[in-house]
Amino acid sequence: LRRRATRSKPSPAEPATAFPRRRVFRFFGWVILVGVTILIVGLGNPGPQYAATRHNAGVFVVEELLGRATPMPAQLAVHKRTNTEIAELAKGRLLDDDHAVLARTRAFMNVSGGPVKALMDYFSVKPEDLYVVHDELDLELGEVKLRLGGGDHGHNGLKSITKSLGGKPYNKVAVGIGRPPGRMAPADYVLKPFSAKEQVDLAIASADAADAILRAIG
């Protein structure tokens, strides 16, 4: 563990990394702003043996957002048609102006693209309204970065999604897990569970990532 994560201050540049959220329609001279469906997916592997591992950092952020739903926390439920677990949150439960779908896939990380694309098709979600939360080796534990498009940084889950979307840009929310110690292979490191101390930093990072997503959506 390199350092203790702290709450980061909102960056003025963060909201600009995402596409505008509202659809604009004109009706007899009136400008009408219509809400959309925002899809937020936390990447990870299925099964209790992977629940606390570093590769599942994205799922922790989805759980943080589930806890923020009003008037009571939301829960994921199996959505067989898309091989995912989802929570549908009507306008006002999490987002003021938009319907939100929080999700995690029931497929393994390397084949995340199929379920994510299926969710987008089912809920008619555009790539600019997709937020994928993932673990990031190249960020220190506790750091959070939101970006639109860009490379996959060797992350197989992102590669799968990018391929399924035909290379169209979408929002990526990186949660830092740090580099493996010594000569440990990254593939082994990401499947190791967080230590008790790291879990404290992860909880703070999950809250920071949730804040960043909500700021970007606006």
Q: Would you name each region that the model predicts?
A:
Residues 31-149, 159-174, 180-185, 200-218:
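Nucleotide and nucleotide-moiety/phosphate-recognizing core
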Residues 8-25:
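Short, often N-terminal, low-complexity regions
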Residues 145-151, 190-194:
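Short glycine-enriched, charge-decorated loop/helix-capping segments at active-site entrances
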Residues 20, 24, 29-32, 36:
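An N-terminal low-complexity intrinsically disordered segment enriched in acidic/polar residues
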Residues 154, 158:
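Short glycine/serine/threonine-rich phosphate/pyrophosphate-binding segments
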